[in-house]
Amino acid sequence: MAKASYFARRRRDIESVLRRDPAARSALEVVLCYPGYKAVRRHRRAHWLWTHNFKLLARLVSQRTVRKTGIEIHPGAVIGEGLFIDHGDGVVIGETTVIGDNVTLYQGVTLGGTGKDTGKRHPTIGDDVVIGAGAKVLGPFTVGKGSKVGAGSIVLKEVPPNCTVVGNPGRIVRKGSVRCVGPDLDQIHLPDPVKDLSLIHI
């Protein structure tokens, strides 16, 4: 995640929405009407306050954002460029989460911790990852670059790059272009989260 200026990041955040949501018609519409964009923009302010030791003020900004957008991002979370939170209601991103560039999160996603451990306890999400509606990624591990997590999945362990994960608990069903079918999954009923995610826009 290369560091960019505040205005450059805003521009790239807007561009990420326009590029990935066919319902978005203009930059002005994104700025005025998209709660996911608003939450990311406000998080960048809160994160600056957090890293400059204005922690209470950062939390106040964060909580105001929850009330306005329904999206909870802890000000300590590190977020790269081009995060697209589609619809967004119910999204929760924990304090030690790290999110790479050009990540897509759908409504109801939780990037959470496990237990009451201190230190790194939330996931690291690689560049170009897509996480489907209602999915939970819980713990201090990495979801590798280019991977996809199907809607409703619960992921509790490391995901290599360019994999597709579905189910509870999450299981890898595709590595790159190779489909991986476990003993309790068959070819007919195997979910295709990539196809499902492409149809989620309304």
Q: Positions of the model-derived regions?
A:
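Conserved beta-strand-loop-alpha-helix hinge in the C-terminal portion
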Residues: 163, 168-183
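Short phosphate-engaging motifs
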Residues: 41, 155, 172
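A generic alpha-helix propensity feature with a strong bias for hydrophobic helices
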Residues: 78, 163, 172, 186, ...
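Solvent-exposed, flexible loop/coil residues
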Residues: 35-36, 41-44, 77, 83, ...
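Terminal amphipathic alpha-helical/low-complexity segments used for targeting or macromolecular assembly
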Residues: 1-69, 179-200
